[in-house]
Regions:
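Rossmann-like dinucleotide-binding domain for NAD(H)/NADP(H)
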Residues: 1-56, 101, 131
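A conserved regulatory-domain signal marking ACT and ACT-like small-molecule sensing domains
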Residues: 44-131
Length: 131
């Protein structure tokens, strides 16, 4: 499909099912996965994106970094955080052939400079602060 090559596009799996029960289950399954991603960053059961199941986070901030899968990205993220004296309380990485997905939980406030530097890492596809 030509859609596969578009940047900033996440394709969702097709779940075949034509019965009323299957349609109801699909109607609950897909929104639940989207809500989980929005609220936690988790990508469990993703078909075309690295799968991460994340713990519930309390008293910290969660940073989401999606990047091209190449060496040195995690080291670069960690150097930026260390330079700003920010402690990492949890870090979760999963990759596929082309995409790297890292979630970094930090234990203190951050400033706009940190966010700017993380967004500017070469190879970054998307970065966001979850909370």
């Amino acid at each position: 499909s030509p859609l596969r090559g578009l940047p900033n596009l996440i394709l969702t799996p097709h779940i075949g099912g034509s019965t009323q029960e299957a349609q109801e289950n699909i109607g609950n399954f897909v929104p639940g996965k989207i809500i989980n991603y929005i609220n936690t960053g988790g990508t469990t059961n993703s078909v075309n994106f690295p799968n991460l199941q994340l713990p519930i986070l309390e008293n910290a901030h969660r940073l989401i970094h999606i990047h091209h899968n190449k060496p040195g990205i995690i080291a670069h993220i960690n150097r930026i955080l260390a330079a700003h004296d920010i402690n990492i309380v949890g870090q979760y990485l999963k990759t596929n052939e082309t995409i790297g997905y890292v979630i970094t939980d930090i234990d203190k406030e951050y400033n706009a400079d940190v966010i700017k530097e993380l967004k500017e890492i070469q190879g970054t596809i998307r970065f966001r602060v979850l909370y």
